[in-house]
Amino acid sequence: ALKPRAKSRVGATGLWQFMFATGKQYGLEVSSYVDERFDPLRSTNAAAKYLASLYKTFGDWDLALAAYNSGRGNVTKAIRRSGGYQNYWNIRPFLPSETAGYLPAFLATFYLFEYAEAHGFQVNKTQLPIHATDTIHVKQMISLDQVAEFTDTKMETLQHLNPSYKLDIIPVLDNKTYVLRLPLTKIGDFVQNEAQIYATAKAEFEAREKPLPQFFEIDSKIRYKVKSGDYLGKIARKFKVRVSQIKKWNGLRTNDLKIGQRLTIYSRNPTAYTLNNL
């Protein structure tokens, strides 16, 4: 995807289309207020680590990209079905149809970015490159609306620079603070009005008719021990995930389970935290 806020029908999110479990595996926070899969910098760093891991597995960048799209298991299976070929184009007929088209689309996009002008395309340069911005650690919960008001910054600009804040609210926890990214020209305005921004935020949050949502992280990695009477559908319902996800996380080819078997599950059951907002 070429949009930081992109989200697919199956839940792949952000510029690098991270699924929930893979994002968590590579350190991206997903909570009721924050989804770092939307953050271009953090998600790109995570994607680089993931791709490096896949390259270490397959020793080939084309295969690493195919595995990025469909998972290690599907690429390994395609290699086996192809008779052992270690080349993307030889195993392509044995890959899922979406993955068969993924690498050509990726390479075509890469080519267009590199040679756009040679083919008559006009490249729109960003009006606010990353080096023209900076971050501030927020000491008290605030909304982007309040920042926009006191720094005279367009709301669209703030949302563009801070895409990971799902509710346009920057939370503060007892044990963690978050950062606000601003144009360099607006840093001084924020610092000058910081106390007033916090005071306004406190008053507005207290005056809300509907209370703010509870902050909870969706990050539980669980090692589950299969018990008598368990089957994948039952376990999936228990942890609010899909059977296909459990199979993918554990490299299962069938639905067969053994008593005592250990399963890795990335549960969506929330872990609640207290907001340090007022």
List PLM regions with ranges:
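Alpha-helical, low-charge segments enriched in small hydrophobic residues
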Residues: A1-L2
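Extracytoplasmic and endomembrane cell-envelope/extracellular-matrix remodeling and assembly machinery
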Residues: Q25, V30-Y33, R37-T57, D62-G233, ...
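Short, surface-exposed glycine/acidic/tryptophan-bearing loops
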Residues: A6-G27
